Amino acid sequence: MPITRAEKEAIIQELKEKFKEARVAVLADYRGLNVAEATRLRRRLREAGCEFKVAKNTLTGLAARQAGLEGLDPYLEGPIAIAFGVDPVAPAKVLSDFIRETRKMEIKAGVLEGTIIDARRVRDLADLPPREVLLARVLGGMQAPLYGFAGALQGTLRKFIYALEAIRKQKAGEA
């Protein structure tokens, strides 16, 4: 049964909002997935805080253009599903892991904070550690010089105190 114009407009509006709200969207060809595998993928994406949508390519293209994304049309061929996420790494990582496991899907492209990226860049994104790990590494890199500086000051202060103590003992011995 064909969908009505109102239903199409609702789908376009929903996809447009998702393209605008999500920091990342990954487009994948889901050809060959059976229902059980699709359900498993949706569950994994949901656990990672992502959403998985399937819509007609023409509606997806219209929604992308309305959201200000030009140039997505060449990737909208064949059965395409979109994984939306707030964490820039999560959808790419979940899809890449799932593809390695099942060998049934193919990443076509992605949208990262309003910029269209190709499949290679999406795979590179999937190889990044999660945001929290990256922040911890940056913070650790910033703290290391401070700890070194504090240690150097502590050592200098300790030597100064030992010198004062030696002078005090020497003066006490002379008196």
Swiss-Prot record:
One of its GO terms (molecular function) is structural constituent of ribosome. It comes from the Bacteria. PROSITE patterns: RIBOSOMAL_L10. Keywords: Ribonucleoprotein, Ribosomal protein, RNA-binding, rRNA-binding. One of its GO terms (cellular component) is large ribosomal subunit. Pfam families: Ribosomal_L10. GO terms for biological process: translation. Forms part of the ribosomal stalk, playing a central role in the interaction of the ribosome with GTP-bound translation factors. Belongs to the universal ribosomal protein uL10 family. Part of the ribosomal stalk of the 50S ribosomal subunit. The N-terminus interacts with L11 and the large rRNA to form the base of the stalk. The C-terminus forms an elongated spine to which L12 dimers bind in a sequential fashion forming a multimeric L10(L12)X complex. PANTHER family: 39S RIBOSOMAL PROTEIN L10, MITOCHONDRIAL. HAMAP family: Ribosomal_uL10. This is Large ribosomal subunit protein uL10. It comes from Pelotomaculum thermopropionicum (strain DSM 13744 / JCM 10971 / SI).
